[in-house]
From Swiss-Prot:
One of its GO terms (cellular component) is cytosol. It comes from Bartonella bacilliformis (strain ATCC 35685 / KC583 / Herrer 020/F12,63). InterPro entries: Hist_DNA-bd, IHF-like_DNA-bd_dom_sf, IHF_alpha. The keyword Transport does not apply. This is Integration host factor subunit alpha. Belongs to the bacterial histone-like protein family. Keywords: DNA recombination, DNA-binding, Transcription, Transcription regulation, Translation regulation. The lineage of its organism: Bacteria, Pseudomonadati, Pseudomonadota, Alphaproteobacteria, Hyphomicrobiales. Gene3D superfamilies: IHF-like DNA-binding proteins. It holds the Pfam family Bac_DNA_binding. It comes from the Bacteria. This protein is one of the two subunits of integration host factor, a specific DNA-binding protein that functions in genetic recombination as well as in transcriptional and translational control.
Length: 103
């Protein structure tokens, strides 16, 4: 694991290099795609990107949690969370790279 974080600027640079758009156009395209994904999730829609992953908003019910330092129980209110489920193709690619590095 490299510990490197890929940012929006990195994505825009990659689009610029690989597609041939200007950096400004590439950055706008990345923002548009991320905005569409965000808007869909806010509306409660599932976002499925074939061969990559599925993003989905799901509801978590109220539950009792515990403060790990004090051990005191505290209620955790119901909330909505975003889940990410990697596609099998992506999982396999990651596994293949990991196995190749082990050799």
């Amino acid at each position: 694991m490299t510990g490197r974080t890929v940012t929006r600027a990195d994505l825009a640079s990659a689009v610029c290099r690989k597609v041939g758009l200007s950096y400004t156009e590439s950055a706008a395209l990345v923002e548009l795609i991320l905005s569409e994904i965000s808007d869909s999730l806010v509306k409660g829609e599932m976002v499925k990107l074939s061969c990559f992953a599925t993003f989905q908003v799901r509801s978590k019910s109220r539950r009792i949690g515990r403060n790990p330092k004090t051990g005191i129980e505290a209620p955790i209110p119901p909330r909505r969370v975003v889940t990410f489920k990697a596609a099998n193709i992506l999982k396999q690619r990651i596994l293949d790279v990991h196995c190749a590095k082990q050799k």
